Structure formats: C-alpha cells, structure tokens
C-alpha cells in the first residue's frame, strides 16, 4: 500500500499547477489579478490602481476592468475545476507542468455582464461557479464584490468551448 504524500507537498504541487495556469495568460499579469486557493475554491483579487478608474468624477471602476476581472475569473475557475478533478483522479500529472506542458484554457463563446452598482476605488474580488462542464462546452457564473461578498457590484454568465484533449 502506498503511503499518502505529506499535506505540504500536495499543497505545493497544487499551487505550482495554479501558478503555471495563471502565468500562461498575459492579461492576468497586465491587470494585476492574483488568485487565492483554499482547497478547490479560487478567489480572484484585483488590487486597486488609479488607472482602473473609468469615471473620475464618481470615482468608479471602469466597466472593462470589471468585465476583465469577471472573465478571467471564469476562465481560470473553469480550467482549475477541470485540472482539480484530473489531479484528484490521477489522470493529470503535475510533472507535465515542470516539463513545460501547460494546460490549454477554455475559449469564450459568449459572456454577459450585469453591472449591479458602481465599483468603488478599492480592491475587488471575484469567484466563479461552474454550472455545467462537459467535454466540449461549459457554462460558468461569476460574481465580483468589494467590501461585502453578499453585495456583489457585478455578476456575469459565460459559455465556453472546452479545449480538446489531444
């Protein structure tokens, strides 16, 4: 019987896979978005920057920055949920990442955003919820909040084309 790996080793491996997935998308770095992993849940953080303000008179976050946060969160959340399942089943080896074999991310088919209120000039958080994930197609819902998770300032729903496993 094989002994289970130490928890710290498993955490480091999962973090390495997540970092490789995120680093594979230049827009994430450009926007300054980072991801916090707690078990299988991911929370995106977009730190406040002055250049993210769209309306300086309110001031309010630019709608494009909000949309970018939500779409990136949905894509990374969907890719991570699939990678998580594969890692748990043992069908994905983190050594692939070390060898430079990065996972392909889903492609956006459509993405609809509901702006519920103005985003304030402060850090924004987002989380994605996969509502359906098949071999070819997936649906994801995402929401963004700032001070109180129960009061999102924007939410989105998107459909994605899943990468083929060639």
Annotated model-derived regions:
Residues 1-53:
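Non-catalytic linker/capping segments at the edges of enzyme domains
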Residues 25, 59-62, 103-105, 120, ...:
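A generic structural micro-feature
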Residues 50-94:
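Hot-dog-fold acyl-thioester-processing enzymes
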Residues 2-12, 76-79, 115-166:
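HotDog/MaoC-like acyl-thioester-processing domains
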Residues 75-125, 130:
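Hydrophobic beta-strand-centered segment that forms part of the acyl-chain substrate-binding groove
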């Amino acid at each position: 019987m094989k002994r289970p790996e130490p928890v710290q080793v498993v955490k480091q491996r999962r973090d390495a896979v997540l970092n490789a997935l995120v680093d594979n998308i230049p827009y994430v770095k450009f926007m300054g978005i980072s991801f916090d992993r707690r078990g299988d849940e991911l929370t995106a953080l977009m730190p406040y920057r002055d250049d993210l303000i769209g309306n300086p008179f309110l001031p309010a976050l630019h709608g494009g920055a909000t949309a970018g946060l939500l779409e990136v969160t949905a894509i990374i959340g969907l890719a991570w949920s699939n990678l998580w399942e594969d890692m748990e089943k043992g069908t994905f080896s983190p050594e692939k990442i070390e060898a430079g074999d990065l996972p392909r991310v889903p492609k956006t088919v459509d993405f609809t955003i509901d702006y519920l209120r103005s985003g304030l000039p402060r850090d924004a958080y987002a989380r994605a919820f996969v509502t359906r994930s098949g071999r070819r197609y997936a649906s994801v819902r995402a929401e963004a909040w700032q001070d109180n998770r129960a009061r999102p300032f924007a939410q989105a729903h998107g459909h994605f084309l899943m990468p083929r496993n060639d």
